Amino acid sequence: MLKKEESLMNIAKMIDHTLLKPNATKEEIKKVCEEAREYGFASVCINPCFVDLAYEMLKDTDVKVCTVVGFPLGANTIETKVVEAVEAVKKGATEIDMVLNISMLKSGEYDYVKKEIGEVVKAVKSHGDIVVKVILETCYLSDEEKIKACEISKEAGADFVKTSTGFGPGGATVEDVKLMRKVVGENFGVKASGGIRSYEDAKAMIEAGANRIGASAGVKIVEEWKKQGLG
């Protein structure tokens, strides 16, 4: 897991190059994969229907294939999330970004939330070294709920907590990233996503404690980083 200083020195290696818009075409997905190959991003984060395509394009690289589960509302049943996650892994995904059940969290149904995360984690990790990131959708949560979601995610065996889907009314904030890092500690992943459009945005999130960045502006971020003489 990259430390803060290492992240700023290798910024491409901690970006999930993302294209999740509903009208993304196959050609646009191919372009994202080509960019990921060229820049050496940590992963491409794409919708489940494109996992097999991304896998074929990137299987001879170090770029991981990341996809989303229960996206973007988190309101699917546990069983549906498990099936969706396992199918994605079988098609070549090695990172799963799952949206927790926001409604259940806000209803205080913490055992349910822990169970759903745990079931997905157990199912995908039985197929190999799969990274599970739990999307909290922080814009809908109080600080107390953010803290509880982080604690539950860690207890349930996930590898990362992630701020946002990018489809809610708000994205990543420095304050939320700092809070999430404080709760999960050093040896756990924090992914900032939603509204990160520049190197300065990414740098602020890294300095706040993020060690993965989700962004559709990955190329722009790296090019700005290079212009500052850092790459």
Swiss-Prot record:
Annotated catalysed reactions: 2-deoxy-D-ribose 5-phosphate = D-glyceraldehyde 3-phosphate + acetaldehyde
This protein's pathway: Carbohydrate degradation; 2-deoxy-D-ribose 1-phosphate degradation; D-glyceraldehyde 3-phosphate and acetaldehyde from 2-deoxy-alpha-D-ribose 1-phosphate: step 2/2
Enzyme class: lyase
Pfam families linked to this entry: DeoC
GO biological process, one term: carbohydrate catabolic process
Location of the protein in the cell: Cytoplasm
Gene Ontology, cellular component aspect: cytoplasm
Record keywords: Cytoplasm, Lyase, Schiff base
InterPro entries found in the cross-reference section: Aldolase_TIM (IPR013785), DeoC (IPR011343), DeoC/FbaB/LacD_aldolase (IPR002915), DeoC_typeI (IPR028581)
Active site: 97, 162, 191
Gene Ontology MF, one: deoxyribose-phosphate aldolase activity
Top-level division of the source organism's lineage: Bacteria
Enzyme Commission number, as recorded: 4.1.2.4
HAMAP family according to UniProt: DeoC_type1
Main function: Catalyzes a reversible aldol reaction between acetaldehyde and D-glyceraldehyde 3-phosphate to generate 2-deoxy-D-ribose 5-phosphate.
Similarity-based family: Belongs to the DeoC/FbaB aldolase family. DeoC type 1 subfamily.
Protein name: Deoxyribose-phosphate aldolase
Organism (species): Caldanaerobacter subterraneus subsp. tengcongensis (strain DSM 15242 / JCM 11007 / NBRC 100824 / MB4) (Thermoanaerobacter tengcongensis)
Upper lineage: Bacteria, Bacillati, Bacillota, Clostridia, Thermoanaerobacterales
Gene that specifies this protein: deoC
